């Protein structure tokens, strides 16, 4: 009987921990990026995708519904200096329904991307509807052009004091966890000053969109 005691103890512990483990696995993160499409749209449904022939509007749509993107920089790491180097960056172009098209970021000098940007501020930001329910609901693979994604190149710049409050409000409404990140990391607000945009939303190659076309769009 004594030999079975450890076995019984392990079984009891497993039974007690199982519900907690399941809850952790199925519960979404409290931040917007941990859900199918966020905390701020109550019904969690995407608005309709703009007509695919309207590249500028599609680009603005993708930017506005994206919570994060892949930011590619030119690496300053000794072993891969001069090579492309990408990292995931949380973004926001404005409060829900009020997107400006400017992709704001909250960055720290401790991030490798920031070290790269200090030497060369040119970067490319990629955003995809794969982060929403759109592609999943339609059965589109993330690499498929039908799973709309955009690439925008430009220069990452620190926002000025006038723009800082808007950048803060835009980011914190979508990423509330940011408010509690350690101040010792010297966070600052930045944005991508866009020079060129590519929209991949159908077969046959990307549409090229200029910044003027992009910012002339009024979101409905």
UniProtKB/Swiss-Prot annotation:
Which portions of the chain have biased composition (kind: Basic and acidic residues)?
A: 33-53
The answer, when asked if Nucleotidyltransferase is one of the entry's keywords, is: no
The protein's PTM annotation reads: N-glycosylated.
Quaternary context: Homodimer. Interacts with IGF2R; the interaction is dependent on glycosylation.
Task: Indicate the family of this protein.
Answer: Belongs to the CREG family.
**Main function:** May contribute to the transcriptional control of cell growth and differentiation. Antagonizes transcriptional activation and cellular transformation by the adenovirus E1A protein. The transcriptional control activity of cell growth requires interaction with IGF2R.
**The name this protein goes by in its record:** Protein CREG1
């Amino acid at each position: 009987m004594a030999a079975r005691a450890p076995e019984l103890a392990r079984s009891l512990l497993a039974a007690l921990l199982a519900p907690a483990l399941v809850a952790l696995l199925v519960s979404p993160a409290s931040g917007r990026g941990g859900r199918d499409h966020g905390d701020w749209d109550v019904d969690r449904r995407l608005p309709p995708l703009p007509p695919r022939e309207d590249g500028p509007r599609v680009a603005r749509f993708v930017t506005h519904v994206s919570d994060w993107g892949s930011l590619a920089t030119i690496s300053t790491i000794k072993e891969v200096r001069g090579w492309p180097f990408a990292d995931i960056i949380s973004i926001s172009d404005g409060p829900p329904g009020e997107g400006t098209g400017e992709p704001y970021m909250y960055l720290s000098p401790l991030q490798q991307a920031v070290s790269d940007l200090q030497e060369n501020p040119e970067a490319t930001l990629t955003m995809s509807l794969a982060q929403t329910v759109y592609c999943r609901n339609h059965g589109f693979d993330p690499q498929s052009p039908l799973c709309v994604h955009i690439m925008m190149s430009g220069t990452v710049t620190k926002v000025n004091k006038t723009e800082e409050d808007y950048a803060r409000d835009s980011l914190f409404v979508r990423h509330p966890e940011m408010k509690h990140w350690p101040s010792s990391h010297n966070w600052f607000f930045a944005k991508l000053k866009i020079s060129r945009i590519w929209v991949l939303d159908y077969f046959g190659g990307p549409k090229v969109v200029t910044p003027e076309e992009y910012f002339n769009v009024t979101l409905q």
